[in-house]
C-alpha cells in the first residue's frame, strides 16, 4: 500500500540501479524488468511472481537519470538510471496486474524482433558504405603507377569486404522478411546480432587497411574513422557477443528447434502421469529414430559429397543446397550425441556450445544468401559473390565441426561421430583465388552488381557526400583511362 496522487492504493515499490542503458538520457518512459514479490498477498496468493515488465515515466518521484555517457567519443545515447523506493500503480505493469510474472516472455519476444533489426541493419549499412567507398578508392589510389586494386593483397581485403557485406545484406533482408510475416525468430535474431556485428567489425578493419593513411587522419573528409571507432559499441550492446556466441545461439536453438526434445521435456513435466508417460514414450522413440536416421544420412551424404541429395532447384547454386543438407545432418547428429552424453553439463561446456552455435549460424547464413540470390532474380553477375559467401560459410561450418569433435570429452563417442560425419576426411575447401579475383572485379567496376551490393547506401552526388564523389571519380577514371594510359606511355618514351 502507498500514496499515489493523494490516494492510498495497492502498487509496486521498486529499487534499481543500472549503469549502461541505451537512450536513458533522453527517455520519457523507462521499460523496466524486475522480480515481483508479494509477501502480504495483496494481489493474489503467490509470494513470488518472478520477472515482471513495467513502463515507468521518468518524471516519477524517486527516478534518477544520470549524466550521459560518451562511449568511444561517439554520439550514442547511453547513460545510467536508478530508482529508490519508487512507488507506482499496478496498472504500470505492461498488460495490467494479470500479466505479473510474465515479463520474461515479453522480453524474449521483444528481443527476438528488435535484436534482428537494429544492430544487424546498422552493420549491413556500414558494410554497404565501406564496400562502395573501398571499391572506388582502390581503383583511384595509385601506387607504383598502378591502382592498388590490382595488388592481390589489397584484392584479398576487398574480397572479404564485398563477401561479408553480401552475407550481412542477405541475412538482414531475409530475416526482416520473416518478421514482416509475423514470425518472432529468437534464434535467427541471436545469430544476426552476433555475426552481423562481427562481420561489420571485419569489414571496418579491412576498409581501414585498404584506405591506409587516409582512414586514420581524422577530419571532415574521413568517412571511415568514426564508423571504425563505433564498432565495439554494436558488439557490446543488446547482449555481449562473447555471451551470445557461447551460450545463447545454441542454448536457445538446441531445445527450441529440436523436433523431439521439447516434447520430451513437456511430457516429463506433465501432471497427468499416464498421459505424460504415453507422450514421453512417443517422443523418445521418435527421437531414437531421428538419431538413427541422421546417422545414416550424415554418413551417406558425406560419402557421396551430397551429390544425390534432393534439392528444390536445378540452378547454378544447386550444389550449395546439397552441401547445406549434408552439414545439417551432421550438425543434428553431433547435437543429439552432445545432449545425450553431456546432458545438462553441455551448457557449462561453453567452447563446445559455441562451436555448435557456429555450425548452426553458418548454415542459417548460407541459407539466407541463397534465398537472397533467388529474391533478387538469380542475377548471374552476382554468382561470384554467392559462391564466395556460401563456400566461406560452409568451410567455417566444417572447421567448427572438426574442432567440436577434436575437443569432445568422450573420445569414444568423438571417434564414432567422426566416422559417420567425416568418413573421407574434411573435403570442403575455402573459396579459390579465381573466385576472389571475380569478386574484386565486381566491387571495383561500375555496374549493376556493385550498385546492388550497396543499394541502400546514400550515394547521391552532392557536396559533402563522399560516396557520391568517389563514384563520380571512379566513372571519370574509367572513362579517361585510355588517355591516362597513353600519357604514361608517352612519359616513358
Where are these regions (language model features)?
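A short core secondary-structure module
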Residues: 7-64
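A glycine-rich, basic-preceded beta-loop-alpha segment at the flavin cofactor/substrate interface
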Residues: 82-115, 132-149, 171, 294-316, ...
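Loop-to-helix element that buttresses phosphate recognition and phosphoryl-transfer chemistry
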Residues: 153-180, 198, 205-208, 361-372
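C-terminal amphipathic alpha-helical interaction region
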Residues: 286-493
Amino acid at each position: 500500500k502507498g500514496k499515489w496522487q493523494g490516494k492510498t492504493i495497492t502498487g509496486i515499490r521498486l529499487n534499481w540501479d543500472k549503469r549502461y542503458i541505451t537512450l536513458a538520457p533522453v527517455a520519457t518512459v523507462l521499460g523496466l524488468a524486475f522480480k515481483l514479490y508479494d509477501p502480504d498477498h495483496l494481489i493474489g496468493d503467490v509470494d513470488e511472481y518472478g520477472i515482471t515488465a513495467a513502463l515507468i515515466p521518468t518524471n516519477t518521484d524517486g527516478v534518477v537519470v544520470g549524466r550521459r555517457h560518451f562511449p568511444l567519443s561517439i554520439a550514442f545515447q547511453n547513460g545510467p538510471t536508478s530508482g529508490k523506493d519508487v512507488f507506482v500503480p499496478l496498472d504500470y505493469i505492461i498488460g495490467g496486474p494479470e500479466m505479473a510474472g510474465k515479463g520474461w516472455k515479453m522480453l524474449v519476444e521483444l528481443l527476438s524482433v528488435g535484436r534482428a533489426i537494429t544492430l544487424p541493419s546498422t552493420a549491413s549499412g556500414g558494410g554497404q558504405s565501406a564496400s562502395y567507398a573501398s571499391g572506388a578508392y582502390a581503383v583511384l589510389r595509385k601506387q607504383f603507377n598502378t591502382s592498388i586494386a590490382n595488388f592481390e593483397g589489397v584484392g584479398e581485403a576487398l574480397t572479404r569486404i564485398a563477401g561479408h557485406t553480401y552475407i550481412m545484406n542477405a541475412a538482414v533482408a531475409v530475416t526482416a522478411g520473416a518478421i514482416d510475416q509475423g514470425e518472432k525468430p529468437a534464434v535467427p535474431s541471436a545469430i544476426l546480432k552476433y555475426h552481423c556485428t562481427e562481420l561489420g567489425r571485419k569489414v571496418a578493419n579491412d576498409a581501414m587497411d585498404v584506405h591506409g593513411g587516409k582512414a586514420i587522419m581524422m577530419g571532415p573528409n574521413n568517412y571511415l574513422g568514426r564508423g571504425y571507432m563505433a564498432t565495439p559499441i554494436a558488439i557490446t550492446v543488446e547482449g555481449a557477443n562473447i555471451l551470445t556466441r557461447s551460450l545463447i545461439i545454441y542454448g536457445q536453438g538446441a531445445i527450441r528447434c529440436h523436433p523431439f526434445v521439447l516434447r520430451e521435456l513437456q511430457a516429463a513435466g506433465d501432471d497427468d502421469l499416464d498421459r505424460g508417460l504415453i507422450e514421453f514414450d512417443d517422443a523418445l522413440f521418435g527421437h531414437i529414430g531421428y538419431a538413427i536416421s541422421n546417422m545414416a544420412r550424415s554418413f551417406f551424404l558425406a560419402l557421396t559429397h551430397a551429390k544425390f541429395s534432393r534439392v528444390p532447384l536445378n540452378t547454378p547454386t544447386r550444389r550449395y543446397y546439397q552441401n547445406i543438407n549434408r552439414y545439417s545432418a551432421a550438425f543434428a547428429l553431433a547435437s543429439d550425441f552432445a545432449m545425450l552424453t553431456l546432458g545438462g553439463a553441455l551448457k557449462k561446456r561453453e567452447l563446445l556450445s559455441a562451436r555448435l552455435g557456429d555450425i548452426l549460424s553458418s548454415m542459417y547464413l548460407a541459407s539466407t544468401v541463397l534465398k537472397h540470390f533467388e529474391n533478387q532474380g538469380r542475377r548471374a553477375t552476382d554468382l561470384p559473390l554467392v559462391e564466395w559467401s556460401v563456400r566461406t560459410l560452409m568451410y567455417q561450418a566444417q572447421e567448427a565441426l572438426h574442432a567440436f569433435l577434436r575437443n569432445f570429452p568422450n573420445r569414444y563417442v568423438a571417434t564414432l561421430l567422426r566416422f559417420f560425419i567425416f568418413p573421407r576426411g574434411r573435403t570442403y575447401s575455402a573459396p579459390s583465388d579465381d573466385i576472389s579475383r571475380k569478386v574484386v572485379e565486381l566491387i571495383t567496376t561500375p555496374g549493376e552488381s556493385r550498385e546492388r551490393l550497396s543499394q541502400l547506401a546514400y550515394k547521391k552526388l552532392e557536396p559533402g557526400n563522399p560516396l557520391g564523389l568517389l563514384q563520380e571519380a571512379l566513372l571519370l577514371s574509367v572513362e579517361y583511362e585510355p588517355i591516362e594510359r597513353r600519357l604514361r606511355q608517352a612519359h616513358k618514351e
